[in-house]
């Protein structure tokens, strides 16, 4: 299709009046400022969580404990066909369809591993700052299925599971723990069995300190979730205003 000068002159285009454009521009500028502030709040809260975890892991009550004393492999297959979830660095355990728009699982997922709420999942998949894979607690309210390549573990308590989750949120902690256990295979693949994952030590505070940590970190995490929700709302508002400029 070729459009020439006369054709373009006859083309009717709808756009907001100058006053409306100025109003939308002003609102967009205000929302951009708010998004920037909100992003900074979220980054600061994430740094706070990291700082709290590092401080607790160096508490005077800490003792070094084999992970095998805190976790046991679940070994439950997906015979009930629970929905397939992935594991994300930033979002934790996520529903593939809800977050990725589609499922990347096999047609038959009965051989997938089941993770209960509170279980620890180890992905064995390198990503970003985590070259040996990521470790996350399943915070989804129901049982989920995950890749058969993942290790799934039941913790001796949910307080311990939460502590392990936040401990391994640190790229440095994850790398220091895992690099001694892993053998790199062909094409940089990670070779580690589910049991081998449990064969190193982590610092664990006493029960009183652990309970205090869980209460504090849970409160901060709940606040962080609200702040992220607000950021998503602001971003949605911005997208809406942008579309209105071209209605």
Please state what every model-predicted region is.
Residues 1-19, 143-149, 183-208:
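A short glycine-rich beta-alpha junction/loop motif
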Residues 2-5, 117-172, 193:
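A short beta-sheet element
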Residues 18, 47-51, 55-79:
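Non-catalytic DNA-recognition/assembly elements of restriction-modification systems
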Residues 23-35, 53-55, 213-224, 246:
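Hydrophobic structural patches
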Residues 70-107, 139, 146:
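DNA target-recognition patches
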